Amino acid sequence: MAGAVQDSLGVDRIWTGILLAVLTGFVVYGGIKRIAHVADVVVPIMALGYIGMALLIIVINIGDIPAVIALIVKNAFGLEEAVGGGMGAAVAQGLRRGLFSNEAGLGSAPNVAAVAYVRHPVSQGIVQSLSVFIDTIIICSCTAFVILLGDVYVAGVQGIDGVVLTQQSLVSHVGGWAQYFLTAAILLFAFSSIIYNYYLGENALTVFTDTEISRHVLRILIVGLVFLGSSAPGATSVFFFSDPMMGILALVNLLAIIMLFPIGLRVLNDYRDQLRQGAEHPVFDPARFSDLDIDANAWRLD
């Protein structure tokens, strides 16, 4: 985000870091209600605005779409890439960056999903699976088309990358104003992501301690790290640390999913059975799962 602001507006990373740290502190000290309000306003604006811009570019360059799709498929699954190990590298890189985009399999998103008030857990599970589709298949594909339809990226040539590459690709399509649009979109996206991840951290902290002091320490650390991350010259060190950490998260969570699969299947079958019986909105009844340690108060319909 700081790189996008510096490239489009010429603002030094340190000033972006200071502003972002102040805004983050304001929100995290406001509690979950303020966090939810910020996310409700910010995320739809970011997603719809960016998708709309990408669709405009795709429509303008509709004749080049078949060639771009062919290029993607050829370079991902071609014989030359497979023999040279390129396909494996592409898959590995895709998995790593895919986790950054949607967190599927990490076990972090359920903490936020659990805040929602729903009649049945499967209902929220369906919504969560849709979010993965929107994040990766729609938004990330939009970015790929924007870059590949432009004339900024040259395969095999070392040059700009990351958000600056996307900015310059947008400029090549629709003019200089596009980099300001993307800067605003990145600001909205990154800020909402910071708030979201803070909530995950606070939620996880309660497992170990639930004191006011511990929450204040966490908030101070988050604000400080936001400043340091924004003012750092590049993201290489962040990815170097995050990649193995996400691998550990995924390993632990996937093992838990395997262990919980029988219970999850029972809950899913309960949802399907109610639909077959004509229920428009299935309701979760803990009494049907009396053998499990379920807090009945968590599923009371007031």
What are these regions (language model features)?
Residues 80, 215-269, 282-302:
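A generic transmembrane alpha-helix motif of multi-pass inner-membrane proteins
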Residues 1-18, 67-88, 154-174, 208-211, ...:
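Inter-helical loop and helix-membrane interface segments of multi-pass membrane transporters/permeases
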Residues 53-71, 115-116, 130-163:
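Extracellular/periplasmic helix-exit of transmembrane alpha-helices
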Residues 19-26, 42, 52, 88-100, ...:
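Hydrophobic alpha-helical transmembrane segments of multi-pass membrane proteins
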Residues 16-21, 25-29, 57-127, 185-190, ...:
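Hydrophobic, membrane-embedded alpha-helices of multi-pass small-molecule transporters
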Residues 2-5, 11-60, 65, 69-73, ...:
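Membrane-interface loop-to-helix entry segments
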Residues 17, 118-134, 211-219:
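Membrane-interface alpha-helices at helix entry/exit sites of multi-pass transporters
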